[in-house]
Amino acid sequence: MDQDAFFFERDPEAEGEAPRKQESLSDVIGLLDVVLSYKPTEIGEDRSWLHGIIDNPKENKPSCKADDNNKDRAISTPTQDHRSGEESGISRRTSESKTETHARILDQQGIHRASRRGTSPNPLPENMGNERNTRIDEDSPNERRHQRSVLTDEDRKMAEDSNKREEDQVEGFPEEIRRSTPLSDDGESRTNNNGRSMETSSTHSTRITDVIINPSPELEDAVLQRNKRRPTIIRRNQTRSERTQNSELHKSTSENSSNLEDHNTKTSPKGPPPKNEESAATPKNNHNHRKTKYTMNNANNNTKSPPTPEHDTTANEEETSNTSVDEMAKLLVSLGVMKSQHEFELSRSASHVFAKRMLKSANYKEMTFNLCGMLISVEKSLENKVEENRTLLKQIQEEINSSRDLHKRFSEYQKEQNSLMMANLSTLHIITDRGGKTGDPSDTTRSPSVFTKGKDNKVKKTRFDPSMEALGGQEFKPDLIREDELRDDIKNPVLEENNNDLQASNASRLIPSTEKHTLHSLKLVIENSPLSRVEKKAYIKSLYKCRTNQEVKNVMELFEEDIDSLTN
């Protein structure tokens, strides 16, 4: 709600008329007891009558000396009430509401005395509901609104200074108020925060400047803090001209409210009003008296009394709450957790929001509540990170398994390729083993580089005939039969080196070796023989010079003959 709704304005001409009274602290305590003992506001009922135009001419002051006919005359408003049963009681109630203020002041003095003794006339808890559904008081169905006096030129001044008042509203309020739920610091609109903001949801209108909502303890504390000394850390960029304008605005509002109190006390009661009308007019006139007395007290406190230690403690609390948030943001930036201080202030992370609320909390109850929220949010975020890491580990494990399968298949494919390459190399080795020469490779005669023309002996090509297989020649027999016959022809197992090549794989021919297995075994036989050392060397040297199997066979026959001659 609008904070300036607690203050009535008055003309600056009438400044000297109202003597300023020095209110004691007991009056303030009694006022707060009255507020706390008042009826709770109710939700969901009609409060459209609050927006009606309040139209009372300036001739109110001499009206107390006029005739009874002028007092009984009702002032009509543009918004007509269509309920038919109320017309007779309107004029009486509007005039008698003025005469009740003196009697109500006496009642409130009795309430103050009762509150000092520890009793209250109606100790009901206050309940501040949603600001869109809150209404002032509980009206019976056949009662109508009473009129309040307002000055048209003051309305104009209020409309002109609306921007200044909005800046003044934002200036002095902390983010959270004692005994209230913490305000959300996410920058949402003030129209949707369940009645916790300190200003009205609509823009300023001159029609509803005097609308008063039953103040709850939260609003009372808020207005008390508003009138205390304000910390300089809240508005650093406020210029000196704005401060002077705001102070002048507060002075004018407090002086106008004291003038209105004088005007209300001058009206003399003509007679006791009926009970049903008194029940309707009592809460609203209570607002008038409470509001004027309250503003007088605040004005006197602002002008005459020095700041109390309570003012200093609340200001220090606000300063420490703001400085603690700034220090936390700077520490996070210096540690590298946040990039900038602005990022921490605008962060929407749950743990960050709870941390900011905990630093700004007013008491230990809110601090523990926000601490629990921060711990739960941190635990939830850690659980989410653990789940993300688990999913990542599962994905990595699946990728590793797939890569293992790929590696296994690739190694098998590589083995196949290696075997094919070795087979191709072995065929190339067979072709180029003797340099393409068909004759004896030991013949080292140089062939001439220039060939003269001569007769070439043309070899006749014989066509293959199946009858050739019956012939004795090996060249016309099929490969399978030829292999079997060659195996059968082998008699000496020591000399089967070339025949074994038919069964061996192609890759085994490329295995590097200094000497063949057959030559090695024959060399061992010669070395273990009882021949002399010179003869052994001669036989081994002749073995290495052999090119065909027949030569090896001849050398070994000679060796056997020598051994037989020695043994015999």
From Swiss-Prot:
Gene3D superfamilies from the UniProt entry: 1.10.287.340, DNA helicase RuvA subunit, C-terminal domain (1.10.8.10), Viral phosphoprotein oligmorisation site domain (1.10.287.320)
GO BP term, example: viral genome replication
Region (L protein binding): 412-445
One Pfam assignment: Paramyxo_P
Biased composition annotated in UniProt, kind: Polar residues: 190-208, 294-305, 441-450
Gene Ontology molecular function, alphabetical: RNA binding; RNA-directed RNA polymerase activity
Annotated stretches, region: Interaction with the nucleocapsid (N-RNA): 479-568
Region entry Disordered, spans: 1-24, 45-324, 434-455
Coiled coil start-end: 387-416
UniProt KW keywords: Coiled coil, Phosphoprotein, Viral RNA replication
Stored InterPro entries: Paramyxo_PProtein_C, PProtein_oligomer_dom1, RNA_pol_Pprot-P_XD_paramyxovir
Ranges of compositional bias, category Basic and acidic residues: 7-24, 56-105, 132-144, 151-167, 239-253
SUPFAM superfamilies (alphabetical): Multimerization domain of the phosphoprotein from sendai virus, Phosphoprotein XD domain
Quaternary structure and interacting proteins, as annotated: Homotetramer. Interacts (via multimerization domain) with polymerase L; this interaction forms the polymerase complex. Interacts (via N-terminus) with N0; this interaction allows P to chaperon N0 before encapsidation and form the N-P complex. Interacts (via C-terminus) with N-RNA template; this interaction positions the polymerase on the template.
Family: Belongs to the respirovirus P protein family.
Function, as annotated: Essential cofactor of the RNA polymerase L that plays a central role in the transcription and replication by forming the polymerase complex with RNA polymerase L and recruiting L to the genomic N-RNA template for RNA synthesis. Also plays a central role in the encapsidation of nascent RNA chains by forming the encapsidation complex with the nucleocapsid protein N (N-P complex). Acts as a chaperone for newly synthesized free N protein, so-called N0, allowing encapsidation of nascent RNA chains during replication.
Record note on domains: The N-terminus consists of a long intrinsically disordered tail. The central part contains the coiled-coil multimerization domain (PMD). Forms a four-stranded coiled coil structure. The C-terminus constitutes the alpha-helical domain that binds to the nucleocapsid (N-RNA complex).
Name of the protein in question: Phosphoprotein
